[in-house]
Amino acid sequence: EAPCGDTSGFEQVRLADLPPEATDTYELIEKGGPYPYPEDGTVFENREGILPDCAEGYYHEYTVKTPSGDDRGARRFVVGDGGEYFYTEDHYESFRLTIVN
């Protein structure tokens, strides 16, 4: 599926330049799990309106573990059905388009 919407306005970051836990999460997503949290893989509704406006169910969210702390923390990947990976480290307040290859 082709990516939905215009992503040209997003800051880009290479996967290798993110915390190592981001690579761990990316590899789990590419394998289809298993995921450490039941919320992983659920639909991300884009209520904040920051990501391109796509059909309901287009985006899914995944936890990027935070080394300290027992909760899920604030880091996530939001992945589009077209293969876009958006990284947030502030719980959806901002996103960077992640270059995964």
UniProtKB/Swiss-Prot annotation:
Keyword Cytoplasm assigned: no
Residue ranges crossing the lipid bilayer per the database entry: none
Keywords: Disulfide bond, Endonuclease, Hydrolase, Lyase, Nuclease
Intrachain disulfide bonds: 4-54
Pfam family, one: Ribonuclease
Keyword check for Nucleotidyltransferase: no
Enzyme class: lyase
Catalytic residues identified in the record: 61, 91
Domain of life: Bacteria
EC number of this enzyme: 4.6.1.24
InterPro entries: N1-like, Ribonuclease/ribotoxin
GO molecular function terms noted in the UniProt entry: lyase activity; ribonuclease T1 activity; RNA binding; RNA endonuclease activity
Catalytic reaction equation(s): [RNA] containing guanosine + H2O = an [RNA fragment]-3'-guanosine-3'-phosphate + a 5'-hydroxy-ribonucleotide-3'-[RNA fragment]
Protein family membership: Belongs to the ribonuclease N1/T1 family.
Protein name, as recorded: Guanyl-specific ribonuclease St
Source organism (scientific name): Saccharopolyspora erythraea
